[in-house]
């Protein structure tokens, strides 16, 4: 019940453009503890470097990649015309949105408390066959690369971007569709 108030307070206290909070996975086996190995902290992304953030927090899934466990600033979304990509074109459109939003973050606040219960059912989208998964993940990689260039951050992220794309396509894609039926 305090998720929004706590996230807004963290944003105001730290000046963060993004607040990330933890969640619990709920399956038919019950409710798990906090999913993400995060801690309460404030990160100066400008000082740390965005590439370093991706390596230390994004890819090892310390802060997750989901768009729904974050508090965003509307002005950043509107000024940069950020929108979700159509799901038939992109798989993990929330991941793409979150990565694009990070191009505009200078300060990030993380809250370790799991505020959200993420219900994962066997018949949910994540449990179903994902048509054209590889094509949709490749499209995600291309769109992220294009957006990074449009933001003028391509040199800064030159070494991390191929790893991000590989991680999403190969590691996550094969895990989600080990048969590779759509390749």
Q: PLM features: what roles do these ranges have?
A:
Residues 2-112, 116-132:
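Donor-binding/catalytic cores of nucleotide-activated saccharide
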């Amino acid at each position: 019940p305090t998720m929004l108030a706590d996230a807004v307070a963290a944003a105001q206290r730290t000046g963060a453009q993004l607040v990330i909070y933890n969640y619990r996975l709920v399956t038919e086996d019950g409710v798990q503890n906090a999913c993400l190995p995060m801690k309460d902290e404030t990160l100066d992304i400008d000082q740390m470097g965005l590439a370093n953030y991706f390596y230390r927090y994004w890819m090892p899934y310390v802060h997750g990649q989901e768009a729904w466990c974050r508090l965003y600033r509307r002005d950043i979304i509107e000024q940069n015309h950020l929108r979700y990509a159509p799901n038939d074109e992109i798989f993990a459109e929330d991941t793409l949105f979150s990565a694009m939003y990070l191009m505009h973050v200078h300060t990030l606040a993380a809250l370790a408390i799991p505020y959200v219960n993420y219900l994962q059912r066997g018949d949910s989208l994540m449990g179903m066959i994902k048509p054209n998964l590889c094509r949709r993940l490749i499209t995600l990689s291309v769109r992220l690369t294009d957006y990074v260039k449009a933001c003028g951050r391509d040199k800064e992220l030159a070494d991390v971007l191929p790893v991000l794309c590989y991680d999403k396509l190969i590691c996550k894609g094969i895990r989600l569709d080990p048969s590779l039926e759509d390749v």
